[in-house]
UniProtKB/Swiss-Prot annotation:
Gene symbol of the encoding locus: pdxH
Pathway this chain belongs to: Cofactor metabolism; pyridoxal 5'-phosphate salvage; pyridoxal 5'-phosphate from pyridoxamine 5'-phosphate: step 1/1; Cofactor metabolism; pyridoxal 5'-phosphate salvage; pyridoxal 5'-phosphate from pyridoxine 5'-phosphate: step 1/1
A single MF term (Gene Ontology): FMN binding
Membership in a protein family: Belongs to the pyridoxamine 5'-phosphate oxidase family.
Swiss-Prot/TrEMBL cofactor(s): FMN
Name of the protein in question: Pyridoxine/pyridoxamine 5'-phosphate oxidase
Pfam families referenced in this protein's UniProt entry, alphabetically: PNP_phzG_C, PNPOx_N
Keywords (A to Z) from UniProt: Flavoprotein, FMN, Oxidoreductase, Pyridoxine biosynthesis
Summary of subunit composition and partner proteins: Homodimer.
Catalytic activity: pyridoxamine 5'-phosphate + O2 + H2O = pyridoxal 5'-phosphate + H2O2 + NH4(+); pyridoxine 5'-phosphate + O2 = pyridoxal 5'-phosphate + H2O2
Amino acid sequence: MSENNEFDIADLRRDYVRGGLRRRDLTTNPLDLFERWLRQACDARLADPTAMCVATVDKSGQPHQRIVLLKHYDAQGMVFYTNLGSNKAQQLEENPRISLHFPWHMLDRQVSITGTAHRLTALEVMKYFHSRPKDSQIAAWVSHQSARISTRGILESKFLELKQKFLQGEIPLPSFWGGYRVSLETIEFWQGRESRLHDRFLYQRDGDGWQIDRLAP
């Protein structure tokens, strides 16, 4: 960074004027409100509305984040898929505590979730794997996620090789590919407001139900 031509970002800001979130807008079950917001994100044609930041912690206590696509949600939690040799999967084996974050900037909204990750069954993984486009199934075989490689050509050559190999018939599920369901412990809904007096509501698991609290911005 040039000392004589510093890129000043301190004054980059905008006003949040898309309305508020009031207690009367809330649902008893947070997944109902999540679904409403997700549908509105899709209707607004946001790019990748199911993209979420997944945060895990390694054995040294160092947090790590990456963007992953949400593929399913229900009363049992939020579901995503990954290579089981990836950094995230290894970290979840050591510490299944996890957080998810949906940044719907264009709607001045965020949803933050904390919980515990549980491995999906082989049947659940297989069902989803075979619903994916064929090239995506092949790519799962090609990439040993997070492994160091010297050139992109290695991936492309392997992809073409496996595309020929799997030209006919069903592509088998790799043993190193799976998924997780995140059981929900807290879920926070954030709505941007004027003068930075944002609306925040926190749902916290309370037995079979949810405790709901408004948080100061």
